[in-house]
């Protein structure tokens, strides 16, 4: 009987070659249907990221102005301040108010974008999560800066009141802090009457200094009144979104911890892989594996 095994092998090779050639021709002709990897559908976030970056720059500028204003108020000493300095402080306060209102409106727009993204893309989409985390971080920083500005104004008010009380005590007139607050509240500053010069040993220079402090207090009171509505809006936002902001902050912190732990584990895995004796033995025995 004739051995036809070699003939069978040759025929098998010819069939395989013909199949490969047919597949190659079909690919060249575009007959095969292309299969693409379809990722999760997410809208383009470049516009949102650009707006967020611009808002972050505005908040950074706002923080710098508030900190600069606070440093200037720390230099308040027990001496008469010129009217030009009071006018400059008033101008800075107006600029801070304009910045704060602008940032507050921009944060409100971000909240609207978050709600819109939740409806269109879902609460777990990448864009929605980015907007939420960025809003939480920016709002928290804006809130802390506003509290710092409020504390700065309150501290300046206390310094002015203390100065007035101390100057009147030196002049021989006892005035309590409650009386000063009442005078400020009702606007009855009878301590500036000319009769005070005859009743006490206060000089015109001391009276002029007290009047300057009075102007500062009135100016500060007006600044607080101007920002009252803004503080109310911030407090309402904190009540409405406080829990969500806290949960977002917790999630971001936990994600950072998880990423750090993962990096450490990857580093240990690479180190253990290099020290694996079996791998070293295989590399020596199998040069082809070692080259890989």
Swiss-Prot record:
Subcellular location(s) of the protein: Cell membrane; Cytoplasm
Annotated Pfam families: Syntaxin
Membrane topology designation: Peripheral membrane protein
Superkingdom of origin: Eukaryota
Function according to Swiss-Prot or TrEMBL: Plays a role in endosomal trafficking of the epidermal growth factor receptor (EGFR).
Family: Belongs to the syntaxin family.
Protein name stated in the entry: Syntaxin-19
Organism: Mus musculus
């Amino acid at each position: 009987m004739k051995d036809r095994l070699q003939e069978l092998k040759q025929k098998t090779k010819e069939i395989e070659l013909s199949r490969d050639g047919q597949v190659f021709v079909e690919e060249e002709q575009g007959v095969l249907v292309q299969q693409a990897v379809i990722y999760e559908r997410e809208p383009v976030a470049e516009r949102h990221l650009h707006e967020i970056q611009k808002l972050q720059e505005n908040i950074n500028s706002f923080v710098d102005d508030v900190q600069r204003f606070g440093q200037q108020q720390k230099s308040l000493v027990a001496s008469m301040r010129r009217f030009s300095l009071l006018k400059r402080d008033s101008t800075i306060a107006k600029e801070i108010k304009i910045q704060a209102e602008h940032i507050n409106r921009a944060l409100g727009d971000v909240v609207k974008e978050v709600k819109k993204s939740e409806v269109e893309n879902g609460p777990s989409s990448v864009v929605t999560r980015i907007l939420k985390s960025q809003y939480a971080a920016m709002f928290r920083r804006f809130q802390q800066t506003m509290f710092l500005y409020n504390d700065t104004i309150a501290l300046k008010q206390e310094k002015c009141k203390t100065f007035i009380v101390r100057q009147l005590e030196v002049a021989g007139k006892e005035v309590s802090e409650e009386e000063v607050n009442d005078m400020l509240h009702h606007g009855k500053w009878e301590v500036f009457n000319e009769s005070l010069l005859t009743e006490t040993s206060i000089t015109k220079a001391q009276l002029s200094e007290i009047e300057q402090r009075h102007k500062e207090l009135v100016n500060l009171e007006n600044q607080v009144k101007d920002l009252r509505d803004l503080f109310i809006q911030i407090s309402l936002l904190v009540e409405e979104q406080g829990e969500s902001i806290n949960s977002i902050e917790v999630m971001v912190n936990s994600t950072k911890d998880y990423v750090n732990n993962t990096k450490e584990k990857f580093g240990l895995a690479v180190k253990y892989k290099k020290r694996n004796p079996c791998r070293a033995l295989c590399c020596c025995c199998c040069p082809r594996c070692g080259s890989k």
